[in-house]
Amino acid sequence: MCSPDRLCFYCYVYILVEFIEWFEGKYDNWAQASSNPTSFAHIFLTHQRTGEFSFHCEQRYSHEKEPYRSKDIVIVPKGDIILVQNPVNDLIFQKMGKVYRGVNKPGVMVKGAELVSRVELGPNYYVVIDGGIDKNGKQVWGSENGPFIFDKKDK
Protein backbone atom coordinates (compact mmCIF):
# COMPACT_ATOMS: atom_id res chain seq x y z
CA MET A 1 0.00 0.00 0.00
CA CYS A 2 1.34 3.43 -0.95
CA SER A 3 1.71 6.33 1.42
CA PRO A 4 2.97 9.87 0.69
CA ASP A 5 6.42 9.03 2.08
CA ARG A 6 6.68 5.54 0.55
CA LEU A 7 5.48 4.99 -3.01
CA CYS A 8 5.07 1.59 -4.61
CA PHE A 9 6.86 1.03 -7.91
CA TYR A 10 3.72 1.59 -10.01
CA CYS A 11 2.84 4.88 -8.31
CA TYR A 12 6.45 6.01 -8.60
CA VAL A 13 6.50 5.34 -12.37
CA TYR A 14 3.04 6.86 -12.88
CA ILE A 15 4.02 10.10 -11.12
CA LEU A 16 7.27 10.36 -13.06
CA VAL A 17 5.58 9.76 -16.45
CA GLU A 18 2.77 12.19 -15.60
CA PHE A 19 5.21 14.90 -14.52
CA ILE A 20 7.24 14.57 -17.74
CA GLU A 21 4.10 14.63 -19.92
CA TRP A 22 2.79 17.74 -18.16
CA PHE A 23 6.18 19.50 -18.17
CA GLU A 24 6.91 18.95 -21.87
CA GLY A 25 5.43 21.45 -24.29
CA LYS A 26 4.95 25.01 -25.42
CA TYR A 27 3.36 27.56 -23.13
CA ASP A 28 2.50 31.24 -23.21
CA ASN A 29 0.94 33.78 -20.87
CA TRP A 30 -1.18 35.55 -23.52
CA ALA A 31 -4.34 35.56 -21.37
CA GLN A 32 -2.49 37.20 -18.49
CA ALA A 33 -0.45 39.62 -20.62
CA SER A 34 -3.42 40.78 -22.71
CA SER A 35 -5.58 41.42 -19.65
CA ASN A 36 -2.81 43.30 -17.81
CA PRO A 37 -0.19 44.50 -20.35
CA THR A 38 1.39 47.09 -18.05
CA SER A 39 2.27 44.40 -15.49
CA PHE A 40 3.06 41.33 -17.62
CA ALA A 41 4.97 41.00 -20.88
CA HIS A 42 3.77 38.35 -23.33
CA ILE A 43 6.25 35.46 -23.00
CA PHE A 44 6.66 32.13 -24.76
CA LEU A 45 8.02 29.26 -22.67
CA THR A 46 9.22 26.00 -24.25
CA HIS A 47 10.19 22.73 -22.57
CA GLN A 48 11.49 20.59 -25.44
CA ARG A 49 12.41 17.01 -24.63
CA THR A 50 15.93 16.06 -25.70
CA GLY A 51 16.26 12.68 -23.99
CA GLU A 52 14.48 10.32 -21.64
CA PHE A 53 14.79 12.73 -18.69
CA SER A 54 16.34 15.81 -20.28
CA PHE A 55 14.87 19.00 -21.73
CA HIS A 56 15.99 22.14 -23.48
CA CYS A 57 14.09 25.10 -22.01
CA GLU A 58 13.71 28.57 -23.51
CA GLN A 59 11.90 31.77 -22.65
CA ARG A 60 11.39 34.60 -25.11
CA TYR A 61 9.31 37.72 -25.41
CA SER A 62 6.64 37.52 -28.12
CA HIS A 63 8.18 40.46 -29.98
CA GLU A 64 11.68 38.88 -30.08
CA LYS A 65 12.98 36.07 -32.27
CA GLU A 66 15.73 34.97 -29.90
CA PRO A 67 15.22 33.70 -26.33
CA TYR A 68 16.35 35.78 -23.38
CA ARG A 69 16.89 32.60 -21.36
CA SER A 70 17.99 29.20 -22.61
CA LYS A 71 19.08 26.22 -20.53
CA ASP A 72 19.27 22.45 -20.45
CA ILE A 73 17.75 20.65 -17.49
CA VAL A 74 17.59 17.06 -16.28
CA ILE A 75 14.72 15.47 -14.36
CA VAL A 76 15.90 13.19 -11.57
CA PRO A 77 13.34 11.11 -9.64
CA LYS A 78 14.23 10.79 -5.95
CA GLY A 79 11.64 8.87 -3.97
CA ASP A 80 8.55 11.02 -3.50
CA ILE A 81 10.18 14.12 -5.02
CA ILE A 82 11.20 15.06 -8.54
CA LEU A 83 14.38 17.06 -8.80
CA VAL A 84 14.70 19.35 -11.81
CA GLN A 85 18.42 19.94 -12.13
CA ASN A 86 18.98 23.43 -13.46
CA PRO A 87 22.32 25.15 -14.21
CA VAL A 88 21.50 28.03 -11.83
CA ASN A 89 19.50 26.27 -9.13
CA ASP A 90 17.63 22.98 -8.79
CA LEU A 91 13.88 22.88 -8.29
CA ILE A 92 12.33 20.31 -5.96
CA PHE A 93 8.82 19.19 -7.02
CA GLN A 94 6.30 17.14 -5.09
CA LYS A 95 2.85 15.97 -6.10
CA MET A 96 0.29 17.83 -4.00
CA GLY A 97 -3.21 16.63 -4.73
CA LYS A 98 -3.76 17.10 -8.47
CA VAL A 99 -0.74 19.35 -9.16
CA TYR A 100 3.03 19.40 -8.76
CA ARG A 101 4.49 22.17 -6.62
CA GLY A 102 8.13 23.11 -6.77
CA VAL A 103 10.52 25.29 -4.80
CA ASN A 104 14.19 26.04 -5.30
CA LYS A 105 16.96 24.87 -3.04
CA PRO A 106 17.75 27.65 -0.55
CA GLY A 107 20.96 29.62 -0.37
CA VAL A 108 21.54 30.41 -4.06
CA MET A 109 22.53 34.01 -4.76
CA VAL A 110 21.49 35.71 -8.01
CA LYS A 111 22.05 39.41 -8.72
CA GLY A 112 23.23 39.94 -5.14
CA ALA A 113 20.11 38.48 -3.51
CA GLU A 114 18.88 35.05 -2.46
CA LEU A 115 16.82 33.39 -5.17
CA VAL A 116 13.30 32.36 -4.17
CA SER A 117 11.32 30.41 -6.79
CA ARG A 118 7.90 28.81 -6.53
CA VAL A 119 6.32 26.80 -9.33
CA GLU A 120 3.04 24.98 -9.88
CA LEU A 121 2.60 22.53 -12.75
CA GLY A 122 -0.80 21.27 -13.81
CA PRO A 123 -1.84 19.24 -16.86
CA ASN A 124 -2.37 22.40 -18.95
CA TYR A 125 -0.55 25.19 -17.14
CA TYR A 126 2.72 26.28 -15.56
CA VAL A 127 2.77 29.03 -12.93
CA VAL A 128 6.05 30.53 -11.74
CA ILE A 129 7.22 33.35 -9.52
CA ASP A 130 10.87 34.19 -9.00
CA GLY A 131 12.42 36.88 -6.91
CA GLY A 132 15.55 37.99 -5.17
CA ILE A 133 15.37 38.62 -1.42
CA ASP A 134 18.07 40.70 0.29
CA LYS A 135 19.51 40.05 3.76
CA ASN A 136 16.77 42.26 5.28
CA GLY A 137 13.98 40.16 3.75
CA LYS A 138 13.11 42.76 1.11
CA GLN A 139 12.42 41.76 -2.49
CA VAL A 140 14.98 43.50 -4.70
CA TRP A 141 14.18 41.93 -8.07
CA GLY A 142 11.50 39.74 -9.65
CA SER A 143 7.81 40.07 -10.36
CA GLU A 144 6.08 42.64 -8.18
CA ASN A 145 2.69 41.81 -9.67
CA GLY A 146 2.41 38.15 -8.78
CA PRO A 147 3.23 34.95 -10.63
CA PHE A 148 3.46 34.46 -14.37
CA ILE A 149 0.63 32.17 -15.50
CA PHE A 150 1.46 30.14 -18.60
CA ASP A 151 -1.16 28.11 -20.48
CA LYS A 152 -0.04 25.02 -22.36
CA LYS A 153 -0.51 25.40 -26.10
CA ASP A 154 0.76 22.06 -27.39
CA LYS A 155 3.27 19.31 -26.80
Where are the model-predicted features located?
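Short secondary-structure subsegments characteristic of cysteine-rich extracellular domains
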Residues: 40-51
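Cysteine-centered motifs
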Residues: 2, 8-11
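Extreme N-terminal tail/first-helix region
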Residues: 11-18
